[in-house]
Regions:
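Aromatic-lined ligand-binding clefts that engage carbohydrates, nucleic acids, or primary amines
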Residues: 60-83, 113-115, 168
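N-terminal pre-domain segments of enzymes
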Residues: 37-49, 175-212, 566-582, 847-854, ...
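C-terminal capping alpha-helices of c-type cytochrome domains
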Residues: 218, 284, 337, 542, ...
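Bacterial N-terminal signal peptides
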Residues: 23-33
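Long, ordered, helix-rich scaffold segments
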Residues: 547, 551, 560-881, 900, ...
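An acidic-aromatic loop/edge-strand motif
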Residues: 37-48, 108-191
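C-type cytochrome heme c attachment motif
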Residues: 541, 880-895, 903-906, 912-922, ...
Length: 1020
């Protein structure tokens, strides 16, 4: 990636060349010389392992007398430098490079600069710059860049001239000096990208991009232009962007032939806050707010003057406002409009009878719990969903559902649909946590999201799995590179955006049967890089926006600047695999034509495919059969002998059959159980039987006893997945011995998530307990959680996002609610005897020293002080200010804090200095609907303001004080209305008791993510 400053310099030199008739040779010599002045951060490989050691060398000639030689060198994390085999310096602080005078060490002829560098953890890199000043005043500069060579093995003489570096590799460059996360350490710059002045988006020089690509910052939005959240491209290649702010107009951006901003104009029509934009059918479709509230609007130019002049309101979606509301619009290959919605939106009541997706439900065998903090309380399935509509928005079909809160989606070149779904970050540390992930969205697909603890595990056959799990983050825009001018690998990639941790990732997919599997890599990374949406222009470049929640917005351009290479011809084996994948997808599409439609040919066509080894084919075939009257296929399902076909058909019958057939259904499920089934088939059988009990009711006593008899010998199993299902079923049937067996698994569980799973299910067991068992169970709540571990996969998800693991905000309350449910199963005598264990240990809050008022701080008080955040801040004073300002009372930070507000561990990835401080001094300027209070107006005229955490048929419960957790219950019969509050739950004036220096230390502490070795805390 080239720096913006250098690009401007090149432009200036070009102008000078034209005016003064510079020779082309001289011009490029100047550019080459200037480029060579800037060292790059390099490493042996892209992804460094913890504690790895790597070796680097660069040979260079010296001709003439050297009057001065100065080396500047640093490495993340340690480096020892050698000149001609002699050790010259060691450094273990990459934020403060070593400067060494080598004048006496340089010799005429060949010299070699070498370095041994060690990584501690995370990303690793080496930076070096050697400046030679000759006696005649001329200079030569040797910098770290990909012309060096590197090795992962130490060899005799490796640091000396003349060493044969056969087998040594070209290192990987992460970017030139100034790139995040290191910054310009030579000039003393900060580790994160510079924030720039007010109204300045993160400079392109602060971003890291895949080798061969270049990023440019085209425009930084002014306050009037707003904080951008969505983007579309019209038929003329112009970009249309939407600010998030209320009543801020949409903007249309015209690009010149070089991809630079030539014109920006407002769309002066009353539509705004567009979570989705689509230009199609000579119209601009807007998912946002307008004269008739939140819904789907269409803008048209009716007189041909190239200005939108008409607004049509097409359709309303109840609950469609906000960040969990109605989102992106995409034109499908069938020329239908597809529209994705978040989990707070209700499915339209006028769905077409031909909708592909039906028959979804909670489908929980044991009672689930709502979110511990009350988020999404009372929200019923189907979760986030996609509808398909005609261009007028009239015919509306439910296409797929069961995501959490997918924001955007796109179709690949083969016409397949994919989305990037969000996680519920408050679930971190629980067995029901689902990471952010990419889904292949197919007809009638259910992806298993249910609120609270009810998320389906990926192996449930009545749902579909992800293409790839990404980890932690906040998904925003997605787009395939199909229309890009990128190399073939990236034209096929799905680009996905993570707002929370400042990254655009490229997902590379491989066909797998009728679907795909995937791998991913970081494509563009920055801090902050609050990415929101992307498009590919007519020039094949990627254009992306930043913004959201009032943060600084910007428009960027990504182009491929590397050497083009001819695509590799696929092998015969690859061509065969591709043909098979195309055929599998074609079969799936044929089966999908029967979804939602009664067709006399459907059962006979689909039935043979119930036995397919491809899960996606079985799923499509089952849904084709479920769309037909049950009486046409019920007997066939009960009589089927092929294991795969039988399990799939009986799953359909469990979902749609009647109580009268239940015992026979369970008997048929046991036909090959267990010896005739592999693990996947056992899991399908267990889920099908659970669905029968959920939807058809508890079976007869005789059948129940037979079920216990068949399951009990298999529990516990060597498979954690089988144990998860067997545990629930045996508790459901109150099987003798299930409590003791489950406590045994609890004792052996290696991760907190697995322990919590067994604790969660055991809370439902009302019988089979001894007092010893009860003591074992309740003792778990009082254990030392510091000893608990998490899976390697979980730890990696956090590491990939550049942060440490932290408990989800709802985890403590989930645990508390599990204990409360378990206590409810005790007899009075048990409750008395176990009282000390049940009570546990009370946590006494540390007293906060009373502070005096200092000043009512404003944002302008700090405008000239942001450069003081670079270095020399105090970690201890920042942490103390964090406590004094009561931040931990409401916010998760690392693995501490409350849950009333958002987790701010990764705040530096999405907020620059100015945006972050603004949220502290003016918390009500932007209030996320995820943390928004409601104002309840009672019939007696009084108001109650707080966060809704519980709702039942006759009452609601609000947290009215986020600092103390005080709750107020309001009877529904007393409520006249309820409205969203425009006032942030975060109290104003929290910084008024801090000095300016303390506030700067506080900002540095938050931006560090709680890491003491952050560059901001290094000495000046």
């Amino acid at each position: 990636m080239r720096e913006v400053g250098q690009l401007k310099l090149e432009t200036m030199l070009k102008a000078r060349m034209n005016s003064q008739r510079f020779s082309l040779v001289l011009f490029f010599a100047l550019i080459s010389s200037l480029s060579a002045q800037v060292p790059e951060w390099i490493w042996h490989n892209q992804n460094a392992a913890d504690d790895e050691v790597r070796y680097f060398r660069k040979e260079f000639p010296v001709s003439g007398t050297v009057a001065k030689a100065t080396l500047t060198i640093a490495a993340d994390n340690q480096v020892t430098a050698y000149l001609n085999g002699k050790k010259i310096v060691s450094n273990d602080n990459w934020g403060t490079p070593s400067r060494v005078d080598l004048t006496k060490e340089i010799k005429p002829g060949q010299n070699v600069l070498a370095a041994q560098a060690k990584n501690e953890s995370g990303i690793a890199a080496l930076m070096a710059k050697l400046v030679l000043t000759y006696a005649d005043g001329k200079k030569a500069t040797i910098v770290s860049d990909p012309t060096w060579v590197s090795s992962d093995k130490e060899a005799a003489g490796w640091a000396e001239p003349g060493f044969a570096a056969a087998g040594w590799a070209k290192p990987v460059s992460f970017g030139k000096l100034g790139v995040a996360p290191w910054g310009d350490v030579i000039a003393g710059g900060q580790a994160s990208a510079p924030a720039g002045p007010a109204g300045q988006a993160t400079p392109a020089a602060g971003l890291t991009v895949v080798d061969g690509f270049k990023v440019e910052l085209l425009h930084s939005a002014s306050q009037e232009e707003g904080s951008w959240i969505s983007m579309a491209i019209d038929a003329k290649g112009r970009l249309i962007v939407s600010p998030q702010g209320d009543k801020q107009p949409l903007l249309r951006i015209t690009l010149d032939p070089q991809g630079q901003v030539a014109k920006m104009e407002k769309i002066e029509l009353p539509v705004w806050t567009a979570m989705g934009l689509l230009h199609a059918f000579d119209s601009l479709y807007v998912s946002g707010n307008g004269p008739q509230g939140t819904g789907l609007y269409r803008l048209r130019d009716t007189n041909g003057d190239d200005q939108y002049d008409q607004v049509d309101f097409l359709r309303k979606f109840e609950g469609g406002g906000g960040e969990h509301g109605s989102h992106a619009l995409v034109l499908g290959p069938d020329q239908m409009i597809y529209y994705i919605h978040g989990n707070f939106v209700k499915v339209p009541s006028d769905l077409s009878p031909a909708s592909q997706h039906k028959n979804y439900a909670e489908d929980q065998l044991l009672p689930r719990q709502e979110d511990g903090n009350g988020f999404g309380v009372g929200i019923k399935p189907p979760g986030s969903f996609v509808v398909r509509m005609d261009r007028e928005g009239k015919t509306c079909e439910l296409y797929a559902s069961g995501m959490r809160n997918a924001y955007d989606f796109d179709f690949n070149a083969a016409g397949e649909m994919f989305t990037f779904d969000s996680d519920m970050e408050w679930d971190w540390g629980t067995p029901w946590y689902r990471p952010i992930r990419v889904y292949h969205l197919v007809s009638a697909g259910d992806y298993g999201f249910r609120e609270g603890t009810g998320k389906f595990p990926d192996y449930y056959p009545d749902s579909l799995p992800p293409v790839v799990d990404i980890g932690v983050g906040s998904p925003t825009g997605v787009k395939f590179g199909t229309r890009s001018a990128f190399p073939a690998k990236y034209r096929k990639a799905l680009f996905i955006m993570d707002w929370s941790y400042g990254r655009i990732l490229a997902v590379h997919m491989t066909p797998a049967g009728a679907s795909y599997t995937g791998m991913f890599e970081n494509f563009v990374v920055g801090k902050p890089l609050n990415v929101t949406d992307l498009e590919f222009g007519k020039d094949g470049a990627m254009y992306f926006t930043t913004g959201g929640r009032g943060t600084q917005a910007g428009l960027y351009r990504v182009t491929f600047a590397g050497a083009s290479t001819a695509p590799r011809s696929p092998s015969a084996e690859e061509r065969k695999a591709e043909r098979e994948a195309v055929a599998a997808r074609a079969l799936r599409h044929k089966l999908e034509t029967f979804h939602g439609k009664v067709d006399s040919h459907a059962v006979d066509f689909a039935w043979p495919h119930l036995k397919s080894n491809d899960r996606w084919i079985r799923y499509a075939a089952r849904l084709a059969i479920e769309s037909q009257p049950v009486e046409l296929w019920q007997k066939r399902a009960l009589d089927e002998r092929d294991v795969n076909a039988s399990l799939t058909a009986l799953l359909a019958l469990a979902r749609l059959g009647s109580k009268e057939v239940e015992d026979e259904l369970i008997e048929s499920l046991g036909r090959s159980w267990p010896d005739g089934m592999n693990e996947e088939q056992k899991l399908e059988a267990l889920r099908a039987s659970s669905l029968a009990y959920i939807r058809l009711g508890r079976p007869s006593t005789e059948t129940s006893q037979e079920v216990i008899k068949s399951l009990d010998p298999l529990y516990p199993s060597a498979s954690s997945r089988l144990n998860r299902e067997l545990c629930q079923l045996l508790i459901y049937f109150e099987a003798p011995g299930v409590v003791r067996k489950t406590l045994g698994l609890l004792a052996k569980a290696e991760t907190e998530e697995e322990q919590l799973l067994y604790m969660f299910h055991l809370r439902n067991a009302r019988s089979g307990w001894s007092m010893e068992d009860r003591r074992t169970y309740f003792s778990w709540f009082n254990r030392d959680r510091a000893q608990d571990k998490h899976s390697d996969e979980t730890v990696k998800w956090f590491r990939d996002a550049g942060r440490d693991y932290g408990d989800g905000a709802s985890l403590p309350k989930f645990i508390s609610n599990i204990r409360k449910d378990a206590v409810a199963t005790l007899t009075d005598a048990e409750r008395t005897e176990l009282a000390p264990l049940i009570a546990g240990q009370k946590v006494v809050a540390k007293a906060v020293v009373q502070r005096s008022f200092v000043k009512d701080w404003k944002l302008d008080d700090f405008t000239s002080a942001f450069d003081q955040l670079n270095k020399g801040r105090s970690f201890e004073k920042g942490r103390e200010a964090f406590a004094v300002a009561q931040c931990l009372a409401c916010h998760r930070f690392g693995n501490e804090g409350g849950s009333t507000g958002p987790d701010i561990t990764g705040a530096a990835s999405r907020f620059n200095h100015r945006d972050l401080l603004e949220t502290l001094v003016d918390p009500s300027k932007v209030v996320s609907d995820q943390y928004q209070n409601i104002v309840v107006t009672k019939k007696d005229g009084s108001d109650v303001t707080g966060r809704l955490v519980e709702e039942s048929g006759d009452k609601i419960v609000l947290i009215t004080n986020p600092l103390t957790g005080d709750r107020t219950t309001v009877s529904k019969q007393d409520i006249r209305k309820r409205d969203p509050s425009k006032i942030s739950p975060m109290p104003e004036g929290l910084l008024t008791i801090l000095s300016k220096e303390e506030i700067l230390d506080l900002l540095a502490y938050i931006e560090s993510g709680g890491k003491k070795d952050h560059a901001a805390f290094r000495s000046r």
